[in-house]
Design a protein with these regions (language model features):
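Short, glycine-rich nucleotide/cofactor-binding loops
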Residues: 4-20, 48-53
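Histidine-anchored nucleotide/phosphate-binding helix
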Residues: 16-33, 38
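Short beta-strand segments
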Residues: 6-8, 39-41, 80, 128-130
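A glycine-rich helix N-cap at a beta->alpha junction
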Residues: 54-84
Length: 130
């Protein structure tokens, strides 16, 4: 059975990103193709901000997601509208808005809600973390 993970809680004000990470690790270790993709929406898109740096004595959630995604070839999608609104932009969006920099972390990609719908329609279950 394949799952889609939908994460909506802020990485800084909720346990949503951490709980989703723990679930994803366990699921992928048990069955490497059990998760088709992770879609971050609302404040959860802040996980993909390359400029955010956690204190050294805290878990680096962004880095943990990047490592997991790399290890299992897991797509990490950020809702483009929510991300741009919160200042998380890739190089092409930076040019579009005539900015000199971008802030999207490696391993994350900006996608529209159509990608979420596609994930939902192609997996057996969607699990939301808020």
């Amino acid at each position: 059975m394949q799952h889609t993970l939908l994460v909506t809680g802020s990485p800084y004000q909720s346990k949503a990103c951490h709980s989703a990470l723990c679930f994803a690790r366990a699921a992928l270790k048990a069955q490497p193709d059990s998760i088709k993709g992770v879609f971050f929406y609302e404040d959860a898109v802040l996980i993909g901000n390359d400029l955010a740096q956690p204190p050294r004595d805290e878990i680096n959630l962004k880095q943990a997601w990047q490592t997991l995604a790399s290890e299992f070839n897991l797509p990490l999608y950020l809702c483009i509208a929510a991300a741009v609104r919160r200042g998380v932009i890739n190089e092409s969006e930076s040019k579009r808005y005539e900015l000199n920099h971008h802030s999207l972390s490696h391993g994350f990609q900006l996608e529209g809600l159509g990608t979420l719908v596609e994930l939902m329609n192609s997996t057996q279950k969607i699990i939301q973390f808020r």
